[in-house]
Design a protein with these regions (language model features):
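An alpha-helical repeat/solenoid feature that recognizes helix-turn-helix modules
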Residues: 1-20, 33-77, 90-133, 137-183, ...
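Alpha-helical segment of the N-proximal tetratricopeptide repeat
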Residues: 21-25
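Acidic, divalent-cation-chelating loop motifs in proteins
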Residues: 26, 89, 192, 288
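Active-site-surrounding "flap" and adjacent substrate/cofactor-binding loops of secreted or lumenal enzymes
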Residues: 75, 82-84
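Predominantly the C-terminal beta-signal and adjacent terminal strand-loop region
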Residues: 285-289, 295
């Protein structure tokens, strides 16, 4: 792949402030607090609690800067976060705390996959194998996933998280059935709308949006599908939609959309990516608070983990974010 992006002093300083904020807000049990709930219309409802998905994202943000469990400036934070994630792994492989659902499970599995290569801890491999088994068995007849295991319908947003976790696990040497990935690609490709170039939330046709399209493209790239009409048209859709949709006030989807948006742009590479990165970095630097955090409905820890991940993806410390 191409060399990692050169470091930019302003971005590095913003990331440093964000990571220091996260290091301060970690709970004694290793978790981070965020709202555990679900999106309702344009808002997000639930109750604050120790959030296993946000804990995984915060740890991934530290790892995206080069820390691993017990090593690097935030090694201790990653280690404590890992203990919380392992403690939240249920007997059937579902990683859940306080009724968190498949999104959180996927981010936790992704984190375990990225940690797997950095540690000899056999608990990590065991939890990751079980977590992958749960993802594979929760895939439904459509080829996708929904909020909970065993639900008959699926949506693109939950699906991309699972595909990315499966890809990271496979890269880490865990067996993932090829059929599972193939069916996911088929489901995501069926969700594409040739008329607009965007991706639908659910089939049959529902809403289209920036974040769904970013998620759809990232799922296809993650599953090894790099060429096709969906890719070019999807990227054009993102460029067209961004200025319309993506400014403050931040909806719940802002950070989620840009987490996948930058990955889609990164896979395309070249000037498309460098222009994209410059633009989202400018936006995020404007939105950062004086205390180093970013904020949104799910909470400051979620937004800060996502923002610092988005800014660090080009540095390619994490295998899942390599081209």
């Amino acid at each position: 792949g191409e060399a990692p992006a050169p470091h930019d002093a302003r971005i590095d300083a913003a990331v440093g402030r964000g990571l220091r904020f996260l290091a301060r807000t970690q709970e004694p049990n290793g978790a981070w607090v965020a709202i555990i709930g679900r999106k309702v219309l344009r808002s997000y409802e639930g109750t604050p609690g120790h959030h296993v998905g946000v804990t995984a994202l915060a740890c991934l943000a530290f790892m995206a800067g080069g820390s691993t469990p017990g090593r690097g400036p935030y090694g201790r934070n990653v280690e404590r976060g890992l203990e919380f994630v392992l403690a939240s792994t249920l007997e059937n492989g579902f990683i859940s705390a306080h009724n968190s659902r498949m999104y959180s499970h996927a981010f936790a599995a992704l984190f375990l996959a990225e940690v797997h290569g950095t540690t000899r801890d056999s608990r990590v491999r065991e939890a990751l194998q079980k977590a992958v088994g749960l993802i594979v068995s929760a895939q439904n007849a459509q080829g996708g996933w929904r909020y909970l295991p065993g639900v008959p319908d699926s949506d693109v947003c939950v699906t991309v998280c699972q595909v990315q976790a499966l890809r990271a696990a496979r890269n880490a040497g865990i067996y993932v059935p090829k059929d599972s990935i193939d069916r996911a690609i088929e489901y995501v490709r069926k969700s594409w709308d040739p008329r607009t170039g965007g991706f639908f939330y659910q089939l049959p046709q529902s809403r289209l949006s920036f974040q769904l399209t970013a998620a759809g493209l990232t799922a296809l790239y993650g599953a090894g599908y790099y060429e096709g009409p969906e890719i070019d048209a999807g990227l054009r859709f993102l460029v067209r939609e961004w200025p319309i949709y993506y400014r403050a006030p931040q909806t719940f989807d802002y950070y989620y959309g840009h987490y996948y948006g930058i990955q889609a742009a990164f896979q395309r590479g070249g000037s498309f990516f460098s222009e994209w990165h410059r633009r989202i970095a400018g936006e995020l630097l404007e939105l950062q608070r004086p205390d180093g955090a970013w904020s949104d409905y799910v909470g400051v820890n979620y937004a800060t983990a996502m923002a610092t991940l988005i800014l660090q993806i080009p540095y390619q410390y994490l295998p899942v974010f390599e081209r």
